[in-house]
A protein has these predicted regions:
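Rhodanese-like catalytic fold shared by cysteine-dependent sulfurtransferases
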Residues: 2-24, 32-61, 72-109
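Short cysteine clusters
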Residues: 68
Length: 109
């Protein structure tokens, strides 16, 4: 166990793992230029600054996962969506975290 894990604990990805198993609506909230540099296949790019303008895209989705570069913008996006009545949102954190969790699930199944 490394020092960061000891100090801050291990990230609990159980909500992310469950959401990934249910064909989620994947939303990359990074900027278009960041998105163009690579993302998850099938993810939609809705930058954090545009989330409020696209609330209708989130309605009637059973599972929503938002992610970004570090997890900060996706946390803000989750908060914005919840303030607008969208409650089934999981903050996937970083793009790297979502990809690693997807790979873990693929290896388990």
């Amino acid at each position: 166990m490394n020092l960061l894990s000891i100090l801050f604990g291990k990230k609990d990805n159980s909500a992310l793992e469950n959401a990934l198993k249910n064909n989620p609506f994947l939303v990359d909230v990074r900027t278009p230029s960041e998105f163009a540099s690579g993302s998850i296949k099938g993810a939609q790019n809705i930058p954090l600054s545009e989330i409020k303008n696209h609330i209708s895209k989130f309605k009637n989705k059973s599972e929503i996962i938002v992610f970004c570069r570090s997890g900060n913008r996706s946390a803000m996006a989750k908060g914005t969506l919840e303030k607008n009545g969208i409650s089934n949102v999981v903050n996937g954190g970083s793009l790297e975290n979502v990809v690693k969790t997807m790979q873990k699930i693929k290896n388990i199944d």
